[in-house]
Amino acid sequence: MKKQIIFLLLFFTSCSNNNISSSTITSITSSNENTSSISNEITSIKSENSSQSTSITKPKLRIYLNPSVQTKNMYTGYKISESDTMNIVAKKAYDLLKKDNRFIVYINDSLKPLKESVNEINSLDIDYHLALHTNAGGGSGSEVYYYENTSSYLAKHSLESFNKYHTFPTRGIKKNNNFYELKNSKAKNKALIEFLFHDKINEANFIINNYDLLATSVYETFINIFNEQ
């Protein structure tokens, strides 16, 4: 009888221990699963944050359009001046650029003389200063002037964008350190485009009949520059 009692005591003790062990194991397993889940969530968050931190926002381009103020340079066959046509083109280009949130754009739309417009440019921390002109003197075609080597980039893009739209000669980009606004502007990049020769009737006709096209070429100049940043 004594042996039977001892056996029963051992049997119940064993069962009790087994229940505790099973409960403990279940708790530990559950804890491990929760820990793993939390760890996965943290990894996911880190991954998302890492992805966000690698996205780069390009800075907006600060642009100043400075159309010709030469009111006495008259177009062959027309009662219209270089200043008239270039202000029309500049305003159209301004409207295109203004609608595009990649750009902050300014314009001399009140015929400010060169000294005043250059002073304004120098107060605005401008990235790209583009002067808009047409040419005279018996030549033909398009050309762009730049100051020193730092602005050949703007000159190159301006000429390439415009040359897509006409079949007149291309006269290339040229360094010129004597133009007042190029010499005195503190913009990071500065250039002066001579679209075509207004003393050639066929080129004067082209300019007057294609204001929107000239404005589009200016707009595309800065799109291309922005995309290359």
Segments predicted by a language model, with ranges:
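Sec-dependent signal peptide recognition
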Residues: K2-L8
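C-terminal motif of bacterial Sec signal peptides marking the signal peptidase cleavage site
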Residues: T13-S14
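N-terminal, intrinsically disordered, polar/charged segments of Gram-positive cell-envelope systems
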Residues: N19-R62
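Active-site histidine-acidic residue metal-binding/catalytic motifs
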Residues: I45-V118, L124
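Structural recognition of the beta-strand scaffold that forms the well-ordered cores
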Residues: R62-N66, I104-N108, D127-H133, E143-Y145, ...
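Active-site-adjacent mobile loop/cap segments within catalytic or ligand-binding domains
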Residues: Y64, H129-G138, N177-Q229
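Solvent-exposed loop/turn segments at secondary-structure junctions
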Residues: V69-K72, S110-K115, T134-G139, N149-S152, ...
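A short, glycine/acidic-enriched catalytic loop
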Residues: N73-S81, N135-H157, S161-F162
